[in-house]
Amino acid sequence: MIPYRALWSNTQFAFDVLTMKPGDKLVSMLPMAHMYGLAFEFLYEFCVGCHIYFLTRMPSPKIIFQAFADIKPNLVVAVPLIIEKIIKKNVLPKLESPAMKILLKVPIINDKIKATVREQMIQAFGGNFYQIIVGGAAFNQEIEQFLKSIDFPYTVGYGMTECAPIICYEDWKRFKTCLLYTSPSPRDTR
């Protein structure tokens, strides 16, 4: 049984590090039985006064993109599998064509292509979010390197259900890799 103090400390931590405001929007993709989803797609947003939109179907890329296009969330909270599936099916195949591989080796063109891919991905996620917070499982290193290479606004939090769930998190602008965490969640649950 997770004590209420653990849930409260996660909610307080979210207030300290996230910048949601009353009226901001979030698409909830994770089940409420998932501690990560409960803490960071419901409890915090509910306490802030955000509008929470629940997906009523299995979160496939098509359903997710339609919801993001309609709602334009201010924050995206997801598990790695969802982000990995989207990138592996919709982005990487386009970049792995023979012509694109050659263009990606040309310095100035490489930067333009990466900027275009980054902008298209931001628009696919609604175009209005500050960052995507990924957590709940390990992140694929190939996908993480790709996101870093295009300067995509994402971060990876680390946690476990027994901690209700967050252990540490870093804002995307300071986040380097999932191996280097710098901001542990404070724990005073007395």
Please state what every model-predicted region is.
Residues 1-9:
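Conserved AMP-binding A3 loop
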Residues 3-4, 61, 186:
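Structural motif detector for alpha-helix initiation sites
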Residues 8-25, 32-119, 153:
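Conserved AMP-binding/adenylation subdomain of ANL enzymes
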Residues 22-24, 176-179:
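Short acidic capping loops at alpha-helix termini that bridge into adjacent secondary structure
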Residues 26, 36, 169-170, 183:
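Transmitter module of two-component histidine kinases
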Residues 29, 55, 134-135, 178:
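Thr-Gly-centered strand-to-loop micro-motif
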Residues 74-77, 87-175:
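Gly/Ser/Thr-rich phosphate-binding loop
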Residues 181-190:
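Single conserved hydrophobic/aromatic residue that forms the stacking wall/gate
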